[in-house]
Amino acid sequence: MKDSYISIVIAYLMVTFILVSSMPIEGEKGELRPHRLSCPPKYASYHCFNGKCVHLVAQDEPGKPYYSCICDKFYIGERCDTLDITNPDYFLKGQSSTQSSI
């Protein structure tokens, strides 16, 4: 009985999460936040140095393109051009392979 109740609660939470995560999110002034699309090829190749270029489409200005970067791990900056050595994981990145071979 307890197991079936837990299964029902878990299923309910999963469905709720899926429904909520697929809903559009409103910004501070009530406008919808932009959707992400892949960058056009002419921007994708040079806009982000160490990351992925995304094309943002603002719903209040659909004709105006915005380009942004989603940086790879350990990189920061507007164009992912700065190595983030302040990230503690940066110094641990090589240790996992060393420890597993011992």
UniProtKB/Swiss-Prot annotation:
Every EGF-like domain range: 43-81
InterPro entries: EGF-like_dom (IPR000742)
Family, as annotated: Belongs to the EGF domain peptide family.
GO MF annotations in UniProt: toxin activity
Species assigned in the record: Rhytidoponera metallica
A GO CC annotation given for this chain: extracellular region
Tissues where the protein occurs: Expressed by the venom gland.
Protein name: OMEGA-ectatommitoxin(02)-Rm1e
Keyword set, alphabetical order: Disulfide bond, EGF-like domain, Neurotoxin, Secreted, Signal, Toxin
SS bonds (residue pairs): C39-C53, C48-C69, C71-C80
Localization: Secreted
Domain of life from the UniProt record: Eukaryota
Role description: Ant peptide with probable defensive activity which acts as a potent agonist of the mammalian epidermal growth factor receptor (EGFR). Mimics, both structurally and functionally, vertebrate epidermal growth factor (EGF) peptide hormones. In vivo, intraplantar injection in mice causes long-lasting (several days) hypersensitivity of the injected paw to both mechanical and thermal stimuli. Its long-lasting effect is unusual for venom toxins whose effects are usually immediate.
Signal sequence segment: 1-30
